[in-house]
Regions:
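Cleavable N-terminal export/targeting peptides
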Residues: 1-22, 233
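Solvent-exposed loop/turn segments connecting transmembrane beta-strands
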Residues: 31-40, 55-60, 71, 104-106, ...
């Protein structure tokens, strides 16, 4: 269930403005989405730019590679690709009674994102659309950095994601071949995925130890809509997140 880092990664999106030109590593724990026991994750962090090209990790779906096609004082429009979009769900990671599912794989996804600074209370807003072979989603986030001291920055944020029916059906749907299979006796019904959403709030703190080293902490909560949480392979509809990270800034 390695792709649960996507939930963790959503918190890093809100703080990219304070992590530009950085690499690092994060560690986080979450409430399981699926019926599995794995709830701790290592999250690579990277934010590197050259001219208008960029590589970012710790974003909503891990690694993204892109290009800023428009860049003005108050907005940036970018195109990017995500080699590992979606979720990786392995039946071997599932709890007893749920191991009869077929594996779900990550897929190449493409996206477009508009970052807009409305010049109101130092807010930052982001709107993105991402799509791949197994469907896609629309993302919206709003955040504001608070510079508590010269070394400490705190960034609260709200994030909303809308998933189309193809995406939900592939990653959370249950087809007849997965019902009551050996190892999957607790899956007794099929489930057809429909369009769904999740909404989350989070807060990230970044403490700069010196010019190059920062320590980060983050926490948040995400609520999944019933179109996801009612799936037989989903365990929780509220996902809690807690973690920390170490960042090196160039």
């Amino acid at each position: 269930m390695k792709r649960k880092i996507t939930i963790l990664g959503a918190l890093f999106v809100i703080a990219q403005s304070i992590m530009a030109g950085s690499i690092g590593v994060g560690y986080g724990v979450t409430t399981p989405i699926y019926h599995n026991d794995k709830n701790d994750y290592i999250l690579p962090i990277v934010d590197v730019e050259y001219d208008k090209f960029f590589i970012k990790g710790g974003s909503t779906y891990g690694l993204s590679l892109g290009y800023r096609i428009l860049e003005e004082d108050n907005y940036v429009l970018s195109l990017y690709g995500m080699p590992f979009g979606g979720y990786e769900v392995k039946n071997s990671d599932m709890k007893y009674g749920y191991k009869g599912i077929e594996d779900r794989d990550t897929h190449l996804m493409g996206g477009i994102e508009l970052t807009y600074y409305p010049n109101i209370y130092n807010l930052q807003t982001k709107v993105a659309a991402e799509y791949g072979e197994e469907g896609g989603h629309f993302n919206f986030s709003i955040s504001r950095p608070y510079h508590i001291t010269s070394n400490l920055t705190v960034v609260p944020a709200i994030n909303y994601v809308f998933y189309d029916s193809n995406f939900v059906d592939y990653y959370f749907g249950v087809n007849p071949n997965e019902v009551r299979k050996p190892g999957g006796e607790k899956i007794i019904n099929t489930f057809n995925g429909k369009s769904a959403h999740r909404i989350g709030v989070g807060i990230l703190g970044n403490y700069r130890v010196n010019d190059n080293i920062s320590i980060m902490g983050f926490t948040g909560v995400t609520k999944l809509s019933g179109e996801i949480s009612n799936s037989p392979i989903v365990e929780n509809d509220v996902i809690y997140i807690l973690g920390t990270g170490l960042i090196y800034t160039f």
